[in-house]
């Protein structure tokens, strides 16, 4: 009897943990199918200012500037350097002097010390507060597609659009990242069609200049891009991801580097959702409250629920034989989840196990991020993925 109670407890916690993923995936598919989110054909008439945060990017800064200069929409450029210890700034200055016609104007802001990317973005927002039009933030390791700035400009001819994010074409050999990115992108597109997504990609993110203030961002947390997207929506306009606005970047080349990146990102998203908990059930936010609430469920409650289910399952299997049909079925499901997780963990996902394994690994990263946060450690000051920079420089 006790074993059966453990089984019921495990089943209840597993349902709590997995239900939001199934519900939100179904909802997002429906929202995409029924959505009418389309990029306008007309230009907005607004100027564009590119915001480029950098730190020790000497290997790739010239390639990044060249990529931006090839855009068919001439823009202003603001580089904010987080106290680089290499020659990022000097290379930038030399390149800009060699190609003076590449941008309408340029400015390099030098921070006295490195405080993390979010602090850098906050300082840059204050510095360009006098500018009108559109701010386009992009990362040094991202290559944006031809015509990206023109497409961004067209989006803002819709007065309801406050922020637009690009969709990654992530290159690399880690199959788990490909599966994760597919799920993540479809979720963001579904949320965008329904109302807004709280999570956009900082590798290519645009917003109306007057929609975000530095005070909207919490400096001692990462996920500055998601903070901006959420702030835009809470300030009254939509934040959407465009599936045809594409940028290319490289995933970390090792599983360890990938997990480090995922845990850092997970902590930033969890902290963002917790800070905005008053909006989870806000009638004023309407549909966006539903999106925030479900993401909070998936990012905060689900990892804890699945961990609890795993503990109960372990206790049951160590203590009791499968005495009932329920216990036998749960043992099979446990084996499936364990195998799925292990296959994705070692970068060997196979059909039928890929989605489940991707979700399990995502829950693992969220749990680790929760534990790290609970210990009082912030990951907003992160170590650079030097393998990615080296690979990009050799292309």
Please report, for each region that a protein language model flagged, where it lies by residue.
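Long helical/loop segments within the catalytic core of UDP-sugar-dependent glycosyltransferases
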Residues: 118-120, 124-126, 132-133, 146-220, ...
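A conserved acidic beta->alpha catalytic loop
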Residues: 67, 81-91, 113-115, 142-143
């Amino acid at each position: 009897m006790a074993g059966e109670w453990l089984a019921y407890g495990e089943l209840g916690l597993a349902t709590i943990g997995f239900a939001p993923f199934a519900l939100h995936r179904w909802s997002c598919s429906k929202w995409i199918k029924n959505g009418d989110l389309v990029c306008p054909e007309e230009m907005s008439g607004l100027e564009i200012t590119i915001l480029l945060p950098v730190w020790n990017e000497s290997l790739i800064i010239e390639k990044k500037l060249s990529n931006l200069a090839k855009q068919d929409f001439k823009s202003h450029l603001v580089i904010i350097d987080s106290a680089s210890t290499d020659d990022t700034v000097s290379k930038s200055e030399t390149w800009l002097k060699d190609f003076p016609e590449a941008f309408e104007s340029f400015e390099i802001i030098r921070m006295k010390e490195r405080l993390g990317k979010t602090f850098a973005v906050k300082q840059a927002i204050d510095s360009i507060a006098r500018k009108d039009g559109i701010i386009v933030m992009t990362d040094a390791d991202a290559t944006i597609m031809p015509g990206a700035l023109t497409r961004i400009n067209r989006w803002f001819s819709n007065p309801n659009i406050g922020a637009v994010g690009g969709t990654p074409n992530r290159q690399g050999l880690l199959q788990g990242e490909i599966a994760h990115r597919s799920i993540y992108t479809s979720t963001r597109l579904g949320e965008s069609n329904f109302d807004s997504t709280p999570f956009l990609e900082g590798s290519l993110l645009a917003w109306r200049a007057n929609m975000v203030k530095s005070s909207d961002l919490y400096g001692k947390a990462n996920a500055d891009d998601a903070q901006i997207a959420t702030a835009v929506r809470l300030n009254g306009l939509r934040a959407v991801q465009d599936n045809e606005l594409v940028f290319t970047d490289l995933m970390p080349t090792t599983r360890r580097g990938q997990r480090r990146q995922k845990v850092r990102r997970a902590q930033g998203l969890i902290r963002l959702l917790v800070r905005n908990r008053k909006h989870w059930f806000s009638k004023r936010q309407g549909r966006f409250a539903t999106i925030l609430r479900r993401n909070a469920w998936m990012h905060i409650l689900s990892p804890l629920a699945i961990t609890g289910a795993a503990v109960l399952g372990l206790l049951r299997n160590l203590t009791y034989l499968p005495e009932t049909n329920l216990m036998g079925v749960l043992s099979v499901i446990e084996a499936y989840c364990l195998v799925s997780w292990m296959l994705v963990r070692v970068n060997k996902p196979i059909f039928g196990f890929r989605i489940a394994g991707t979700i399990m690994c995502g829950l693992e990263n969220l749990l680790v991020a929760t534990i790290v946060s609970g210990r009082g450690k912030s990951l907003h000051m992160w170590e650079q993925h030097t393998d990615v920079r080296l690979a990009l420089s050799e292309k």
